[in-house]
Amino acid sequence: LKHEDTNLHISSQCWLKCLKNSKHNVVISSRGGLLFLRGMSHHPKPPQLRAVWAQSQEEGAPFLVLPLVQKP
């Protein structure tokens, strides 16, 4: 499951900040410029990701795959 909409690209720092503030056990791995997120059903997400997360859950995806963009 890949979401290649450029509007959904976010920086890794943004996600790391969100996840550090989370008390949920979230498994993260980054491979080939993609960010793999698991167990985020109840995790606070940036507004631009809520819709795509809901869609991926409806499609039965076990985890959310996002393209990573390194911002200066």
Curated annotation (Swiss-Prot):
Family designation: Belongs to the arrestin family.
Keyword terms: Sensory transduction
Tissue expression pattern: Adrenal, cerebral cortex, heart, hypothalamus, intestine, liver, lung, pituitary, retina and testis.
Lineage: Eukaryota, Metazoa, Chordata, Craniata, Vertebrata
Protein name as annotated: Arrestin-E
